[in-house]
Amino acid sequence: YSNSEDSAGGGTPFHSYNVKSISASSSLKEEQYGQDVVYAPINLFRAFEIGCRCHPYWWNYSHIPWVEGAKGYGINETISVEFKNQIYGFSILNGYADIQNMKLFKENSRVKKLKVEDLTNKLEYTMNFEDKVYFNYLELSKPSKSIKLTILEVYKGTKYQDTCISALIENTRA
């Protein structure tokens, strides 16, 4: 995905104005109700919609997460993001977060440990996640324009091996 194309449809994602490009080592593709569904990495930036002045954004109820498409639990699967403007940190909403179908969080696998590589500054971080729905924030020690996320460990899903991440929200202010 590059910001000049919107291959997954559905209009402009709320947070993607700063995304120059995004890619993943794999993405799950499946058929639902006769339609092909791709759980692409750009979905990380589609969790919220633009709102009004009093409520600047709200949850996008038609949002689907990024889901790795490798065999097994997705260990060592990656997401790479290049930003137009530097970021100072970011938040991740782990797992399959769906307000209308909350059982999907436990049914699918979730990240337990994530390696974060700051490709701009050649720095490395580790993010550890609790097994619950929340935003986990990582503050970068230096501003960056390029990051790579690698799944190191997962919480296994009760029904599916597929590992999911629902959202990534970058912090563009120091």
What label would you give each PLM region?
Residues 32-35, 86, 100, 161:
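Residue-identity detector for glutamine
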Residues 83-86, 156:
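Generic detector of short alpha-helix boundary/capping microenvironments
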Residues 14, 45-48, 83, 90, ...:
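Phenylalanine-focused residue identity feature
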Residues 20, 88-89, 112, 166:
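A short, local hydrophobic-aromatic micro-motif
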Residues 87-95, 99:
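Mid-length scaffold segments of soluble, non-membrane domains
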Residues 25-28, 73-76, 96-174:
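Trp- and acidic/polar-enriched beta-sheet ligand-binding modules for extracellular glycan
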Residues 1-78, 82, 174:
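Disordered, acidic Ser/Thr/Pro-rich linker "stalks" and the adjacent N-terminal cap
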Residues 80-81, 89-90, 149:
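Hydrophobic beta-strand segments within beta-rich accessory/binding domains
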